[in-house]
Swiss-Prot record:
The UniProt record lists the keyword Transmembrane: yes
EC number: 2.3.1.269
Residues at the catalytic site: E289 (proton acceptor), K353, C406 (nucleophile)
Name recorded for this polypeptide: Apolipoprotein N-acyltransferase
Residue spans crossing the bilayer: 37-57, 75-95, 106-126, 128-148, 179-199, 207-227, 505-525
Pfam families named among the record's database cross-references: CN_hydrolase, LNT_N
Family: Belongs to the CN hydrolase family. Apolipoprotein N-acyltransferase subfamily.
Domain CN hydrolase: 245-494
Keyword vocabulary terms for this entry: Acyltransferase, Cell inner membrane, Cell membrane, Membrane, Transferase, Transmembrane, Transmembrane helix
UniProt organism field: Brucella melitensis biotype 1 (strain ATCC 23456 / CCUG 17765 / NCTC 10094 / 16M)
Length: 532
């Protein structure tokens, strides 16, 4: 039955092959949040393998033509995957549809079309190393792992919905990322998902199926072993109590001058709210990204109001736009920042967002694109300016938090050595742009995995959710649902040392890629000697 199905898929040609690849990619989206149907990967990836088998089997095409046919299959798979997984980005443009609706096709179709090029590249690389049976599955895993790694930094990077997340729907299955990293998880996921393609036979097919089963069991077993040694989820004697404020301000209200006071009062009111019975008095209070609707340096009354709201010894970490006056009356610069404010209403420190969102917070190639009207996409005059370095924010009692603002949390190993000595990751964000769509759930999952990857607990304050405190095993110690209004009160979990310490992330990635490459090439050479 499987052989018959595979044969039919392999024989598809032209638009039928493209449609099958597109639908297979779209089906693979079910492996990502909020669906987390990881078994969908065992359908979509074998189909992709068979489609590439069909492209390679063309006897009427030369080597270059077959390579391009494989790339075309990969592109259609990627286009289906990214269209179905990222369509919600377009909802941000509908908040002010009169001004931004024109850009909807670029967001919903243009971005997926560009990102699909990475999967076209993955298919091309796999084709270069393709061999019968197990060899093509290894080549497949290598090609996709390499493409996913490139997606983390090419053109500033956009590693959203990396395939590795499909293998980590729950904390039990997140623990391996601390050992092999997110690129390693992507390679593992692709290899295991694609392994059913070996049920049709081929060189070392049984070995490949056995290896996939072993890797899957090792992945689960390592997670179970790690969690069995983990401390209690909530430490009732924790050294630091944290409150996250989630105001759920509608995006249309955020920059309405008439609503600024109401927004600010809502934040202050939630800050002053007494803890529920059994919950600790907070030492640190966190507001979401750009929560403060004022420029603090020029609004001393707002700082005074914050100081009055904080109890003795409390510290507020709040997202706000920071203005830096231009020299000699020049244009000011604006930063997306986190402020640390003490109980006297004094600004203790600030941290600026380093990794800005292209076309959302700044305009790449501005001089070239200004004539196209894209400058209007950026809210602040001239857009945001990127911070120069990421540094820890001193909080209290010698503890410090590493700031990740908004989508900085999607980048694996974004912290690097800077995480050394920090007590936690603080991630402030505003996902109200995207409403009740898959976007906020996908964003949260990626931040959740950062806690496991870096060995640091996560404090995540989101304007409309999902706000949560996550321990270093990926377990949620307190949270608020999407669009809820309220606070999360919980003790801060303890950090733990990352599995490999804190070497540069690329070292781990390169070792994994070289291992896969060596295995693929070695299997090709061995097969040629034995079977030819």
């Amino acid at each position: 039955m499987i052989a018959r199905l595979a044969g039919r898929i392999i024989l598809l040609n032209g638009w039928r092959r493209a449609l099958a690849a597109f639908l297979s990619g779209a089906f693979a989206t079910l492996t990502q949040p909020p669906f987390d149907i990881f078994v969908a990967g065992f359908v979509s990836f074998p189909v992709l393998v068979w489609l590439i088998d069909g492209a390679i089997a063309r006897t009427d095409a030369g080597p270059l033509r077959r390579l391009l046919l494989a790339a075309k299959v990969g592109w259609w798979f990627g286009f289906g995957y990214f269209v179905s997984g990222l369509w919600w980005i377009g909802t941000a443009l509908l908040v002010d549809a009169d001004q931004f609706a024109w850009a909807l096709p670029l967001a919903v179709l243009g971005l997926p079309a560009f990102l699909a090029l990475f999967y076209a590249f993955a298919a091309m690389i796999a084709r270069l190393l393709w061999s019968d049976g197990l060899g093509r599955i290894l080549a497949f895993a290598f090609g996709f792992a390499l493409a996913e790694w490139l997606r983390t930094f090419i053109f500033t990077g956009f590693p959203w919905n990396l395939i590795g997340y499909a293998a980590m729907p729950v904390p039990l299955l997140m623990q391996s990322v601390a050992v092999i990293g997110l690129v390693g998880m992507s390679a593992l996921a692709v290899f295991v998902f694609a392994a059913p393609a070996l049920l049709t036979g081929g060189h070392f097919a049984r070995t490949g199926i056995g290896l996939a089963i072993f890797l899957a069991l090792a992945h689960v077993g390592f997670g179970a072993w790690t969690l069995s040694r983990a401390p209690a989820i909530v430490d009732e004697n924790g050294p630091l109590a944290v409150r996250i404020v989630q105001p759920s301000i509608a995006q249309a209200m955020k920059w309405d001058n008439a609503e600024r006071r109401a927004i600010f009062d809502k934040l202050v009111g939630l800050t002053e709210e007494a803890p529920a019975e059994g919950k600790p008095r907070p030492d640190v209070i966190v507001w979401p990204e750009t929560a403060i609707p004022y420029i603090l340096e020029s609004t001393p009354q707002a700082l005074a109001h914050i100081g009055d709201a904080l109890q003795e010894g409390q510290v507020l970490l709040a997202g706000a736009v920071r203005e830096e006056k231009g020299a000699d009356g020049g244009e000011p610069r604006y930063y997306n920042s986190i402020y640390t404010i003490d109980d006297r209403g004094r600004i203790v420190s600030t941290a600026d967002k380093v990794h800005l969102v292209p076309f959302g917070e700044y305009l790449p190639f501005e001089s070239f694109l200004r004539g196209l009207g894209l400058q209007e996409v950026v809210e602040m005059p001239g857009g945001f300016t990127a911070g120069t370095t990421r540094h820890a924010l001193a909080v209290k009692d010698g503890r410090s938090f590493l700031p990740l603002i908004c989508y900085e949390a999607i980048f694996p190993d974004e912290l690097g050595y800077e995480g050394a000595g920090a007590s936690a990751i603080i991630n402030v964000t505003n996902d109200a742009w995207y409403g009740d769509t898959p976007g906020p759930y996908q964003h949260f999952r990626q931040a959740q995995v950062r806690a496991v990857e870096q060995g640091l607990p996560l404090i995540r304050a989101a304007n409309n959710g999902l706000s949560a405190i996550v321990d270093t095993y990926g377990r949620i110690t307190g949270s608020l649902a999407l669009d809820a209004v309220g606070v999360v009160d919980s003790y801060l979990p303890s950090p733990r040392d990352p599995f490999w310490g804190r070497p540069p992330g690329w070292i781990q990635t390169v070792l994994i890629l070289l291992t896969l490459l060596a295995a693929s090439v070695g299997l090709i050479l061995y097969s040629r000697r034995r079977f030819h």
